[in-house]
Amino acid sequence: MPPLHLGLILPNYGERLDVERLVGTALAAEEAGFDSGWVTDHLLAPPEHAGIYGSIAEPLVSLGFLAARTTRLQLGVSALVVPQRNPLVVLKQLTTLDFLSKGRIVTAVAAGWMENEFALLGADFEHRGRTLNEWLRVAASAFEQMPGLLRFDSGEGWLAPALVRPGGPELWVAGISPQTLRRAALTGVWHPVALPPDELRPMLEELRTRRPDSRVIPRVSAYFQDEPRRGVDERGRYAVAGPPEWIAERLAAYVDVGCDGFVVNLDYDAPGLEDRLWRFAEQVVPSLGN
């Protein structure tokens, strides 16, 4: 069995947003042995969501900054809302990040859920799924053609520099809808968010009937507390809460249903994040047999 992939949600948003805290967390994650660090995406949070997303650093700019400060850590967005952006500009940004990071970009993409944000940006919410489907097709074609003159439906153009990572930045698909599973079968990696193992299992099995070699790496919130319980994250979704051995047991349940790793949110906006990531690395990861 390959080693579990261990990613960490980095604090690029929240009341405690601070550049040194963001960089320090990424460097600590790299030193502690995490495989990847992930920022979160929102561009313009409407007032009703400002309590969580009102203070957020743009994710792709953040990845470029973090790429210059780290050396080994893979860097990604969980998850990049492609339909809110110019699709070819996104390709240019991701391939440039691949170049700047020396091939360390791996990112999840999603159709998005915040309708008012789409309205603020003048983006098409109703057809966002169709937009993402088309972008995935274009991205796959572009990565195959690079370097050189690329042919798009709208014409021809150069998308340089050449790719560092063979095949281009690794694309995961985030979400929990049936459409998400169809997209994940194309890219090969599914990134569900806030699903308990028992709800994830049938969807995982369906995905692997479509593509047996698919990897599944969920985003899971895990909070250190004295007493074990079913917790909730900042948006009221499923989370794991308890002492280290309980968290390890709950995460092992994901492995038991077929997951290939996790991207963990260790309460990104609370004080002491670096202490928690070290505690996770030293007291939880060894129990997972990784």
Task: Identify what each model region corresponds to.
Residues 1-290:
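Active-site-adjacent structural elements that line small-molecule/cofactor binding pockets in enzymes
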